[in-house]
């Protein structure tokens, strides 16, 4: 065999070997296990700033993006109806207190003196009737007065005696004042009226809505001059210090996201990675179930909602930023 033929065969073998090696490499690259990338989103605690008082918005003191402190004035409400109710409640309380004070103080001196005079007059009438009856009785015993006259004198004596007793009881009532039950009832009415005043005043305090936390204004839903229903969230705030990552994890990767386990995620918007710790997981609804297409080799996989807190401060992060978590094969 000539040298040219040997060189030609050698070239064919070399080319075939290179082609085979290339096919092996391509096959490996095509079918090797690949890393799975899960995408989640950053969230933060949201608070609604609302008022217990329905009314017209007087003024909103903040706008979207403002950083405010706990206790800062957020908005105020004008409510003339509530101020009118306060005036009514205060008037009712004054009236109830006056009645309670009168009952507690007892009868006036004039009432007591009048009752005493009536009793003394009835007492004098009773004494006179008693003496008259004694005289008539003596005359009857001596045969001078008739039985009819004696009975009339006795009836007059009995009547004046009962009148004296009734007048004396009224005098005692005037001295003692109202009964304990009347005093308790009057005091209870005063307390109820005071409670109405306190209730209206507590509502009036809520016409000025204050920030419940240190945070950022995420949205303003009503402006000055608009009507606000009771409890309507006029302003929304977010607490950037209370943030977490929410991510949907297929069941087959759940072992990587046990509660308390730490993992790393990449935040494209911040061009940095951050560590997170799983604090909560829960199965998602059937809409998130991955249905198997081949019952012999695969199975339906549930998806789980995982919440994880960042282990470091995420400076300049915003709600809704994506976080990419790589699951190594």
UniProtKB/Swiss-Prot annotation:
Question: What GO cellular component is one of the record's annotations?
Answer: membrane
| The organism's place on the tree of life at top rank | Bacteria
Signal peptide as annotated in the record = none
Q: Which UniProt keywords apply?
A: Membrane, Transmembrane, Transmembrane helix
User: Localized where?
Assistant: Membrane
Which sequence ranges are marked TM in the entry? 11-31
Q: How does the protein associate with the membrane?
A: Single-pass membrane protein
Name the InterPro entries for this protein. Answer: CusB_D23 (IPR032317)
Sorted alphabetically, which PANTHER family does this protein's record hold? 36 KDA ANTIGEN, 36 KDA ANTIGEN-RELATED
Family of the protein in this entry: Belongs to the membrane fusion protein (MFP) (TC 8.A.1) family.
Output this protein's name. Answer: 36 kDa antigen
| Species per Swiss-Prot/TrEMBL record | Helicobacter pylori (strain J99 / ATCC 700824)
């Amino acid at each position: 065999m000539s040298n040219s033929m040997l060189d030609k065969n050698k070239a064919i073998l070399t080319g075939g070997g290179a082609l085979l090696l290339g096919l092996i490499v391509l096959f490996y690259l095509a079918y090797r296990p690949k890393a799975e990338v899960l995408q989640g989103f950053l969230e933060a605690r949201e608070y609604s700033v609302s008022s217990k008082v329905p009314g017209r918005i007087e003024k909103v003191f903040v706008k979207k993006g403002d950083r405010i402190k706990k206790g800062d004035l957020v908005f105020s409400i004008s409510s003339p109806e509530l101020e009118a109710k306060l005036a009514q409640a205060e008037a009712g309380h004054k009236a109830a207190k006056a009645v309670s004070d009168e009952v507690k103080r007892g009868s006036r001196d004039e009432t007591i003196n009048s009752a005493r005079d009536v009793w003394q007059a009835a007492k004098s009438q009773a004494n006179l009737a008693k003496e008259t009856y004694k005289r008539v009785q003596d005359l009857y015993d001596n045969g001078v007065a008739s039985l009819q006259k004696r009975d009339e004198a006795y009836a007059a004596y009995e009547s004046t005696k009962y009148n004296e007793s009734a007048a004396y009881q009224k005098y005692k009532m005037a001295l003692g004042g109202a009964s304990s039950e009347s005093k308790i009832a009057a005091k209870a009415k005063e307390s109820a009226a005071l409670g109405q005043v306190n209730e209206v005043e507590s509502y009036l305090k809520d016409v000025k809505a204050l920030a419940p936390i240190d945070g950022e204004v995420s949205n303003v839903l009503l402006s000055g001059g608009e009507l606000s229903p009771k409890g309507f969230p006029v302003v929304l705030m977010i607490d950037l210090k209370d943030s977490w990552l929410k991510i949907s994890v297929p069941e087959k990767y759940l072992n990587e996201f046990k509660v308390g386990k730490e993992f790393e995620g990449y935040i494209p918007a911040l061009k940095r990675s951050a560590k997170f710790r799983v604090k909560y997981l829960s199965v998602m609804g059937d809409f998130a179930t991955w249905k198997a297409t081949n019952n012999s080799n695969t199975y339906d996989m549930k998806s789980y909602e995982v919440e994880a807190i960042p282990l470091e401060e995420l400076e300049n992060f915003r709600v809704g930023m994506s976080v990419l978590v790589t699951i190594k094969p």
